[in-house]
A protein has these predicted regions:
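Cysteine endopeptidase catalytic domains of the caspase/legumain-like
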Residues: 1-138
Length: 138
């Protein structure tokens, strides 16, 4: 994880969101989705909100001392499964069609411990000014 820290120190963009679904990932300090049948559409509201937030945020699947669970029935790690569900709209708490880092973290920090019998707890670290946007719900 020291390599990740070194990379972060060399980067100068206004916004960085680093997401890690790996065991002991809590020790670490925008993508558009489209399917063959549906084109990705980016709204003006999404672009406006995307350009406002500033900061560096790290979302990890678990605390530094925890193992990140993989579940065959979910097809992913538990954290990734609930993060993807959140980006599909379940994390959009205010129903504005935009999922922010805070909304996604709030969603996974509730769902992941529930699904793992309180054995795994996502972590959010970093400094943010305003809201950082992760995605738009279609």
């Amino acid at each position: 994880m020291r390599e990740v820290e070194t990379i972060f120190q060399r980067l100068t963009p206004e916004r960085i969101i680093f997401i890690s679904d790996s065991c002991y990932s809590g020790a670490t300090a925008g993508r558009t989705f489209a399917t063959a049948s549906r084109r990705a559409v980016v709204s003006e509201t999404f672009l406006s909100r995307l350009s406002k937030g500033k900061g560096r945020v790290v979302l990890t699947a678990s605390k530094a001392s925890e193992v990140s669970e993989e579940r065959e029935d979910l097809g992913h790690g538990v954290f990734t499964y609930y993060l993807l569900e959140g980006l599909k709209g379940k994390a959009d708490a205010d129903k504005d069609g935009i999922v922010t880092v805070d909304e996604a973290y709030s969603y996974v920090s509730k769902k992941v411990p529930e699904a793992t019998g309180q054995n795994q707890h996502p972590v959010k670290k970093g400094e943010v000014e305003g809201q950082l946007v992760l995605g738009q719900v279609h």
